[in-house]
């Protein structure tokens, strides 16, 4: 019996894959649990439509990430902080950087996608990687300066 997988299953395959399974396994396990649907003509057409829509969404996200890359790689984000000689009081986190970018330039980014291994604790210039899309890494220049 041919079924279309709705969830990734270790021994069968990934989401959207059409696999051939024994009728009892499909009837008693896969179908009742919502892990698969029968591979009928209408379900196959729906799957193809869903794959096309997903590909279109991914292309749109990539194009949006490319536009964001052009903007972000040409600017330096300045973050004023209270500081001593070189050490700052507290630290600058990915969330602080995202808020400063939103406040200064009106650009909203997801702080979770900003590669910052540990919070910044010293004044200086930093180059961070932001990944809005797996194929589009963005180099963001951040300058942490003492507040006057």
Swiss-Prot record:
KW Ribonucleoprotein (keyword) present: yes
Q: Which family does it belong to?
A: Belongs to the bacterial ribosomal protein bL9 family.
Gene transcribed to yield this protein: rplI
Query: What does the function comment of this entry state?
Result: Binds to the 23S rRNA.
Presence of the UniProt keyword Transmembrane helix in the record: no
Q: Name one Pfam family in it.
A: Ribosomal_L9_N
What SUPFAM superfamilies does the record tag this protein with? L9 N-domain-like, Ribosomal protein L9 C-domain
Instruction: Tell me one GO biological process term.
Output: translation
Any one GO molecular-function label of the UniProt entry: structural constituent of ribosome
Origin superkingdom? Bacteria
Bilayer-crossing residues are: none
Q: Which organism is it from?
A: Thermus thermophilus (strain ATCC BAA-163 / DSM 7039 / HB27)
- Gene Ontology cellular-component annotations: ribonucleoprotein complex; ribosome
Q: Which InterPro entries match?
A: Ribosomal_bL9, Ribosomal_bL9/RNase_H1_N, Ribosomal_bL9_bac/chp, Ribosomal_bL9_C, Ribosomal_bL9_C_sf, Ribosomal_bL9_N, Ribosomal_bL9_N_sf
- Tell me the PANTHER family matching this sequence: 50S RIBOSOMAL PROTEIN L9 (PTHR21368)
Protein's name according to its UniProt entry: Large ribosomal subunit protein bL9
Please name the PROSITE patterns in this protein's record.
Answer: RIBOSOMAL_L9
Q: Which UniProt keywords apply?
A: Ribonucleoprotein, Ribosomal protein, RNA-binding, rRNA-binding
